[in-house]
Swiss-Prot record:
Feature: compositional bias, Low complexity: 216-243, 263-278, 432-442, 699-718, 1439-1450, 1461-1470
Gene Ontology CC entries for this record: eukaryotic translation initiation factor 4F complex
Source organism of this protein record: Oryza sativa subsp. japonica (Rice)
Ranges annotated as biased composition (Basic and acidic residues): 1-12, 545-564, 571-587, 633-643, 964-990, 1290-1299, 1411-1432, 1490-1503, 1559-1572
Protein name in the entry: Eukaryotic translation initiation factor 4G
Protein keywords: Initiation factor, Protein biosynthesis, Translation regulation
Length: 1792
């Protein structure tokens, strides 16, 4: 298939070609050459799903498409090309051709810019389709061929005019002869790109049906090039496949040839159905299904994230149009070969949006089999998790593994620098040739090229199953906006100079992967150095030594969290940046690896690149961003934790070997080198050459522009110039509009630097791209600016270069916009940072001579951009993110992410927003103050781009004064920087131009006329240290400062963008955060940043890292994570929810900046502040305190609160009257608690003293009596008022009002009557008063009042027993005669008549309540009653279920749980009744009873009735009629004894006792209303032959001793609460264990020793009742045996209850009085008591007990009874009193 080689045009790639993801994504751009220099062509042809189809290479690797090689490459081995062999050149393009005009040119796929040859393909690989994935390091290719001509000679490369073949960002021919056009990406709203038109024309040619031979036709112009390219690409493991940008090439699992179907391309915005070429898939270990067409939405450029804990494989840019699916292999520590999954015969149209790209969540360890793929319809993606444990490293199931070493050849010596050697901290080989395992792409619906409501919706998510391996299968990532997405590059180690793409070799070299210099993605896509392929990087001849780089421990593999992809996409205007991100002829090709630096501090910044400015097509020198390739060896002892970067193997050659001219020093202005916390401080500080402080001071002293250029004190500019002979084409920033800024964002933890803290964090505050002056003078001047950081110097003076971490944070967080300020500051910061190389300063001077702008551009650009040494992090501009977002990127993405600028617009077109000097000054002041408060780092990060002021990252060691003195010499340079930075904002490729509207900040722009020299404006830069000294004095924000003004700019972007700071790329694959909350789909809207209108916000960087669930569940060590972020669960349970938001939340909560959506609410303050509880009047304060106590009064806390009342100083009559009034008010409104309030009055009367007033004694009782009378009369008066008709002049009352008033009066009267009765019971009132009250209530009984009669009945029920005695018998008879007459009167309502009847019956029954009067209950009583009610209900329900089911043996077991029988028919597991009657297994769904959560903690008894042997249990009514009617049967429950917990819980009746045995045989034994006590949990199945009458008592059941003990204790406790003797009797009967009764007695008596007197009294009554009962449940023998046991242990009991002897004596006395025991029997028990008989008497305890007995008898019955008892007992008291006791209680009775 012939296809055009135009820039914007993708080329049909051979489907069989698997990219060198190690089987995964193509290393370079989306297409073979898209990644330019990618080890192989991208495995997937670019799918033009982006809004703008200019983005020829949607592949993450690069933006440009390389011309695919002829088919012969894939199948026939060709001789390896020579090292300098260059691909065929395309026809010359006009130099002044518009950026967006496509110039047809093949993209060299595997060539270093310098012409270095690509790694050779192993000859054994016969078939490219089956060849193992290439492990080369992919280099993202610029969207358009680099226009920067490389001066380096490329042998055998035809120089075709102005054609410059570029490998990645490196010109393939290595010469400067011609410059290829680089075209900026444009969004769909931008004017149409001519290349699209050409593509339209070329399409018919390009889309020819591929012959069955699987040999796609190459474009005509490429067919000529095939010989050359074959030679070059054959060495490489994977030849690039041609693809058209809009082509979708389906892969076929089977190797059968398939004729691709190529629909015609309608227009650039429409996806063209790709031809479906036959692809030879890798041999899968699993049976493959020949082909499975699957409709799967393609997720554009979503690198599949590597889910393993170990080094991450660089993310592969998934070419949107490719149908091949990269399946990342899980690998522990060894390089893995990612397989490509081919889904043949899949076609999709752009219009349909759901391309067939299937992102597999976790790498499939075996060849993708069709059976593994889940067919999903519509928008749903297929998330396929590996069914088997991912293959361990080095175990590649697919096809023969192809190890391609990255060869970096020196152009002159052709010496190869091998990157194969694994040098990461783990000592294992990284995956240099293996593309980063595709990050799991969230299976969101369709790509987000346009905003579809459902395109990013979670509803379509398909979650892969988790794998058994420790590495959790990465969750598929969601698609990013293809239009502006830059594939986030994971390699943090890259320092993408602003000018240079993130793919700059400098960054890549540091990273284990040789990073392909990625050119800015046209669409602003984050170029992901996806698939870092093997790239032959020829070291520029300029380098004195080209040594093998040591692989930096940290590999560039770390993707930036938000796709702050390392796509060093720069503004289209940047000719140089476009031309070649880092087409550097200089030896700067690779940053020195950290290890090398650590090892050899002296090494010059070998890695630093000197960018030669190559004249662009427009004739302007292009600036290759000079980046300090050298990275601090973050960890000499690089621990895995510190390896923030995915630990991809660094190039085998050590960085030390790769040396740049030592004389040249790269200065990273504003780069703060953070001294590593301890490990290798010196080594870490490789990025910034640390100059001596004196040097810095000198630079600071220089006030002239030359000074601002940071004239180096010691280094000669000559060195720099030598190194930078290739001119750094800074290019007019106007045209270059380089928006690529070294993202100062690099977070402290740039990658995981925070983890060990060893890594020195360096942030290059300067944004070179922005710095480039518009009017930059000739590039020649600029080339001097290029300088290499002298790493040796840095290493030597680490401390000096060390900057405050906060400053670094400031840098890191500050957005690229801030970088503009930094650019102004760059010279200052450079000067301030001791690391400035002299040469750089001189260069700056030279440049400064040209113009102020130049100075800034050259010095800062060349110097500053080199600095970004954040260990492995390259600040990359995030094309999607506004610079405000970039702040986040730097922190989040360890890999420096250069923000790709929309390259489509020339820089001239870019509006350069400039801040007014005043605005900047205000911002600086504000930020300095915030910084002083310690909040500047993150606060600045969240400010709008225009508001961020970058603090100069001066080394802390530097004098702040020196920094302060240093001024940027030229305002114009500052202006340029601002312009560049603002351009970056505008150029940031938003997803849509509509979104760009939000980004527009015209108000922030400053007119060019305002540009003044820095000195003229008086603007100075101060170090953070110096500003901190002013923190104490500067505490107020500027006048008129409003936070919302800044938030307004920030929030629109925040709403839809990913934040680097918030979501830093974790240092390791395992640490990589799972899907972020801000990327949630429609269903889950972010609660903080959700912005109406755009679900995903403008320019939002759709998550390329919606990746695997965090395995370690920790983010990059130094990065602040969302405090609320939860760990996500793998699988559909917790989809995409791992981190709900950004760290902005934390700052929002701290009030550092306002809420993003709503302005801060102004708090309204009252003039007079209300203070709670302050009362001026002392008396009022007392009354309030008393009222508070009464409000809390309950039976439980009565005693405690009464003590508080006594603490209140009640010292006068007024206070006492107030207390009584409050008590009455409470009692009258709460009649139920009248008893408690009466008790309160009783205690209060005894505690309060008497008062005298006017010589009159005032007592509490008297005041209380007066109050009672007053309230009584008041009630009558109120009732009369309610009944009387309105008089004239009074307000008329409605009927309802009068009724309400009457009810209120009646309630108060009833409460008063009840309180009076309770007070009388407490002897607080006299009997005469009670009679008076009764008479008043009876009143005129001929015409009775119902309210009074009701009150009378209440009073009688309260005090009747006390007042009805012989003396008052006449009065009482008279009262009840009247009441009897009233009970038959028809004048009263039936309710009142029944009340009268009840009172009369009560008197007849000797005032024994038929049912207990409900008084206030304690909370435990309430719970108990509720539990009993539930038991009763469950019993009834259980009965009904059993009767209904019939006596079926084997019937489903009934669940008689306390909550009812909701689960009665649940699963058979309910047979296993567990504790509390709940089935031991969970109930069936929906069977849980509503009371499940209502169970009180006290309801811990199970209602299981202990099984009987063979006896049936009668259920149902227990009256005589009920006998014989209930179903009987044998319980299914085994007869094994239940546990004590179960057996002791048998209560289910109202009082908590189960009475299953109440169906007695004796006539009249029917106990009313006992049905609730039927054992609810017993289960009946088989019928019994026994007649019902033979059931007998239930006491035949056997219980263990423990069960009996617990049941007896439970029974007595229930008795203390319920006071129901009959219930205890029933419990004793059920126990049916007479032999255990003595133990019951001893247990109860011993328990009573620690109880209250009232409970002991109750126990005494119970014993008497049980002994005197008809059934004689407790015989005398049982009682005496139990008491003997008590006496035996009494000595021990005295230690716990010192008065136990006294308590026992009272009990025994009661037995004597009740004639249960005689005094003689009691004496015998005492005499024999003790552990040994007579021991109690010997110790004197017996005398105490007997003395208590005699004393109690005397008190209760008097002396006469006592004497009679003594006489009848014949006791000799002397026998009980030991002689050694001095005195005893018996002494008093012995004398008598």
């Amino acid at each position: 298939m012939s296809q055009r080689g135009d820039r914007g045009e993708g080329h049909a790639r051979r489907p069989g070609r698997s990219s060198s993801f190690g089987g995964g994504h193509r290393g370079g751009g989306g297409v073979g050459g898209a990644g330019k220099g990618g080890g192989g062509s991208s495995g997937q042809p670019p799918l033009a799903t982006n809004r703008s189809f200019r983005k020829s290479g949607n592949g993450h690797g690069g933006h440009q498409r390389a011309v695919s090689q002829p088919d012969t490459h894939g199948f026939q081995p060709a001789p390896a090309p020579t090292a300098l062999q260059t691909p065929p050149l395309r026809p010359p393009a006009p130099q002044n051709a518009p950026a967006h005009v496509p110039v047809p040119a093949p993209r060299p796929q595997h060539h270093d810019p310098s012409g270095a040859r690509a790694p050779t393909l192993p000859p054994s690989s016969e078939n490219t389709a089956n060849a193992p994935p290439l492990k080369g390091i992919p280099h993202a290719a610029p969207r358009a061929p680099s226009r920067i001509s490389s001066t380096s000679t490329s042998q055998g490369a035809p120089k075709g005019g102005a054609y410059n073949l570029q490998f990645g960002s490196f010109p393939m021919n290595g010469g400067t002869g011609g410059s290829t056009m680089q075209f900026p990406a444009r969004t769909s709203s931008a004017p149409p790109n001519l290349d699209e038109q050409k593509r339209m024309q070329a399409l018919p040619e390009g889309h020819k049906v591929v012959p069955s031979g699987l040999v796609p036709q190459a474009p005509k112009h490429q067919q000529q090039q095939q010989p050359l390219q074959q030679q070059k690409q054959q060495p490489q493991s994977q030849p690039p496949l041609q693809q058209t940008r809009k082509d979708v090439v389906s892969s076929n699992h089977s190797s059968k040839p398939i004729n691709p179907h190529i629909p015609s391309q309608v227009k650039s915005s429409v996806h063209v159905s790709p031809s479906v070429p036959n692809v030879a898939p890798p041999r899968p270990p699993v049976q493959q299904i020949p082909g499975m067409p699957m409709s799967m939405p393609f997720h554009h450029q979503a690198p599949l994230q590597f889910g393993g804990h170990n080094p991450q494989i660089p993310p592969q840019g998934v070419v949107p149009s490719s149908l091949q699916m990269s399946m990342g292999l899980h690998g522990a520590n060894a390089p893995q070969v990612a397989q490509q999954m081919y889904i043949p015969t899949i076609q999709h149209h752009h219009q349909l949006q759901p391309p067939t790209m299937m992102h597999q969540a976790a790498g499939i360890p075996y060849g993708p089999a069709a059976h593994q793929l889940t067919q999903m319809s519509g928008m749903m993606n297929v998330g396929v998790a590996p069914q088997f444990t991912p293959q361990q490293p080095n175990k590649y199931v697919t096809g023969p593994t192809r190890k391609t070493t990255v060869k970096i050849t020196h152009p002159d010596t052709h010496e190869e620098l091998k990157l194969d050697k694994r040098m990461d901290s783990s000592g294992q080989r990284g995956l240099p040739s293996v593309q980063q395992q595709s990050q799991p792409v969230s299976t969101y619906g369709s790509p987000m090229g346009f905003y579809q409501q459902n395109s990013y919706n979670q509803s379509t998510m398909f979650y892969p199953t988790t794998s058994g391996v420790g590495q959790v299968p990465t969750v598929s990532q969601g698609p990013r906006f293809v239009s502006t997405q830059t594939v986030s590059y994971i390699s943090p180690s890259m320092n993408t100079g602003p000018g240079s793409n993130k793919d700059n070799l400098a960054g890549s070299t540091t990273s284990g992967h040789s990073q392909v210099t990625g050119k800015p993605h046209p669409a602003g896509l984050h170029m992901e150095k996806s698939g870092v392929q093997t790239v032959t990087i020829s070291a520029p001849p300029g380098k004195s030594d080209v040594n093998k780089l040591k692989p930096a421990e940290d590999v560039v593999s770390h993707r930036q969290k938000d796709n702050e992809a390392v796509s060093g996409v720069r503004k289209s205007g940047e000719n140089e940046s476009k031309a070649s991100p880092i087409t550097e002829k200089h030896p700067t090709p690779v940053s020195q690896p950290l290890q090398a630096l650590a090892a050899n501090p002296e090494t010059t910044a070998a890695a630093s690149f000197v960018v030669n400015s190559v004249p662009g097509d427009d004739g302007k020198s292009k600036e290759s961003i000079q980046r300090t390739g050298s990275f601090k060896d973050s960890n000499k002892n690089a621990t895995k934790d510190t390896r923030n970067l995915s630990q991809e193997p660094q190039s085998a050659s050590s960085a030390e070997d790769l040396k740049v001219h030592t004389s040249v020093k790269d200065v990273c202005c504003g780069v703060s080198l953070m001294e590593s916390k301890g490990v290798n401080k010196e080594s870490e500080q490789t990025n910034a050459a640390s100059a001596s402080p004196t040097e810095m001071l000198k630079a600071a002293d220089a006030s002239s522009i030359d000074r601002s250029s940071a004239r180096s004190t010691s280094e000669s500019t000559e060195n720099v110039q030598e190194v930078g002979k290739s001119d750094v084409a800074i290019g007019d920033s106007e045209k270059s509009g380089i928006t690529n800024k070294v993202s100062p964002d690099l977070t402290k933890d740039d990658i995981s630097s925070g983890s060990t803290g060893n890594e020195s964090h360096e942030v290059c505050t300067l944004d070179l791209a922005e710095q480039l002056p518009v009017g930059a003078s000739n590039p020649d001047n600029l080339d001097t600016a290029t300088s290499v950081t002298d790493q040796g110097q840095l290493l030597k003076e680490p401390s000096s270069s060390v900057s405050d971490e906060n400053v670094i944070m400031d840098r890191s967080h500050q957005s690229a916009e801030k970088m503009s300020d930094l650019v102004d500051d760059t010279v200052a910061s450079v000067a301030s940072s001791e690391t400035l190389p002299e040469s750089i300063i001189q260069n700056a001077n030279a440049k400064g001579n040209t113009s102020g702008n130049q100075e800034t551009g050259s010095a800062t650009s060349s110097n500053i951009l080199n600095v970004l040494p954040v260990p492995h992090s390259v600040a990359s501009e995030d094309p999607l993110k506004p610079e405000s977002m970039l702040k986040d990127q730097s922190s989040s993405a360890p890999a420096a992410s250069a923000r790709p600028v929309s390259r489509e617009k020339p820089s001239v077109e870019i509006t350069r927003t400039k801040f007014t000097a005043v605005k900047k000054k205000k911002r600086r002041e504000m930020l300095s103050k915030a910084d002083a408060a310690g909040s500047s780092d993150l606060y600045n990060a969240y400010k709008g781009p225009e508001e961020k002021v970058d603090f100069i990252g001066a080394s802390e060691s530097l004098d702040s004064s020196s920094i302060a003195d240093h001024e940027l010499p030229d305002e114009s340079s500052e202006k340029e920087v601002n312009m560049g930075e603002d351009e970056g904002k505008k150029k940031v490729e938003l997803d849509d131009w509509e979104d760009a509207a939000e980004m527009s900040t015209p108000k922030l722009e400053r007119s060019d006329s305002s540009n003044q020299t820095t000195e003229a404006n008086g603007r100075k830069r101060y170090s953070r240290d110096f500003l901190l000294t002013l923190a104490q004095s500067c505490t107020n924000l500027p006048v008129g400062f409003q936070m919302i003004e800044y938030a307004s700019v920030l929030f629109p972007n925040l709403a839809g963008k990913s934040y680097v700071v918030d979501h830093p790329s974790p240092g390791r694959g395992a640490d990589r955060p799972a899907s972020r909350g801000d990327r949630r789909g429609v269903v889950i809207e972010d609660d903080r940043w959700g912005k109406s209108g755009h679900l995903f916000g403008s320019g939002r960087d759709m998550s390329m890292d919606n990746g695997p669930p965090t395995m370690n569940h920790r983010g990059a060590p130094g990065v602040m994570r969302n405090p609320r972020g939860g760990l996500i669960n793998v699988g559909p349970v917790a989809p995409q929810m791992s981190r709900s938001g950004s760290d902005a939340d934390r700052w929002q909560q701290k009030g550092i900046f306002p809420s993003p959506v709503t302005p801060m609410q102004v708090m309204h303050k009252a003039e007079k502040k209300y203070v709670v509880g302050k009362v001026s009047d002392e008396e009022e304060a007392k009354q309030r305190q008393l009222k508070a106590i009464l409000n809390k009064l309950t039976p439980q806390n009565f005693e405690k609160l009464f003590e508080k009342v006594k603490e209140v100083n009640i010292d006068n009559v007024a206070t006492l009257t107030g207390v009584i009034s409050q008590i009455f008010d409470k009692a009258l409104m709460e009649p139920t608690f009248c008893e408690m309030y009466a008790n309160f009055c009783f205690h209060l009367a005894g505690a309060l003293p008497d008062f005298s007033e006017d010589n009159e004694k005032i007592t509490f009782k008297r005041l209380l009596l007066n109050k009672c009378q007053e309230e009584f009369e008041r009630g009558e008066r109120e009732e009369a008022e309610a009944d009387k008709t309105e008089e004239e002049g009074e307000i008329k009352q409605t009927k309802e009002e009068r009724e309400e008033k009457r009810i209120r009066a009646r309630r108060r009267m009833l409460g008063n009557i009840r309180l009076i009765g309770e007070l009388y019971k407490k002897r607080m009132l006299t009997e005469r008063i009670m009679h008076e009250c009764i008479k008043k209530l009876l009143g005129n009984y001929q015409n009775p009042d119902e309210e009074n009669i009701e009150a009378l009945c209440k009073l009688m029920s309260t005090i009747g027993e006390m007042i009805d005695h012989a003396k008052a018998k006449e009065h009482m008879d008279a009262y009840f005669d009247i009441m009897l007459k009233l009970s038959t009167s028809q004048q009263l309502s039936s309710r009142v008549r029944f009340m009268l009847r009840d009172s009369i019956d009560l008197r007849k029954n000797k005032w024994q309540q038929r049912r207990k009067v409900e008084g206030p209950k304690k909370i435990d009583e309430v719970h108990r009653d509720a539990a009993q009610e539930r038991h009763a209900q469950s019993s009834r329900l259980a009965r009904g279920s059993v009767v209904g089911s019939g006596p079926r043996r084997g019937a489903a077991p009934m669940d008689y749980g306390p909550r009812g029988s909701a689960a009665a028919l649940a699963s058979p597991s309910s047979q296993q009744v567990g504790h509390r009657g709940m089935p031991s297994h969970s109930r069936g769904f929906g069977t849980q009873d509503i009371r499940f959560e209502e169970r009180s903690p006290l309801d811990h008894r199970t209602t299981v009735l202990p099984p009987r042997k063979d006896e049936a249990i009668t259920l149902g009514p227990q009256g005589g009629l009920a006998r014989g009617m209930s179903i009987r049967g044998q319980p299914l429950i085994s007869n094994a004894e239940l546990s004590s917990a179960d057996s002791r819980r048998m209560v289910s009746g109202p009082n908590g006792y189960n009475s299953a045995s109440t169906a007695r045989e004796e006539p009249g034994s029917r106990i009313p209303d006992r049905s609730g006590r039927i054992a609810p949990n017993t289960q009946f199945a088989g019928p019994s032959n026994r007649p019902a009458s033979q059931e007998g008592r239930s006491g035949n059941k056997l219980y263990s001793e423990d069960d009996l003990r617990e049941k007896s204790i439970s029974a007595i406790r229930e008795y203390y609460s319920a006071k129901d003797e009959k219930e205890v009797a029933l419990c004793i009967e059920e126990l049916n264990a007479p032999s255990f009764y003595p133990s019951v007695v001893s247990l109860w008596v011993n328990d009573s020793f620690e109880r209250k007197d009232m409970e002991r009294e109750l126990l005494t009554k119970l014993f008497v009742s049980l002994c005197n009962s008809r059934n004689n449940l407790l015989s005398k023998s049982h009682l005496t045996a139990g008491l003997a046991t008590v006496l035996g242990s009494l000595e021990d009991a005295l230690s716990d209850a010192p008065r136990a002897a006294e308590y026992l004596g009272r009990l025994l006395a009661r037995f004597v009085v009740e004639s249960i025991l005689s005094l003689q029997e009691v004496g015998t028990l005492i005499e024999k008591g003790g552990e040994e008989p007579g021991e109690l008497v010997h110790h004197g305890i017996g005398a105490d007990v007997l003395g208590a007995v005699l004393e109690s008898i005397k008190v209760e019955k008097g002396d006469s009874f006592l004497n009679e008892a003594k006489a009848s007992s014949n006791l000799k008291l002397e026998d009980f009193r030991p002689q050694h006791l001095k005195r005893s209680k018996l002494d008093a009775f012995m004398k008598a």
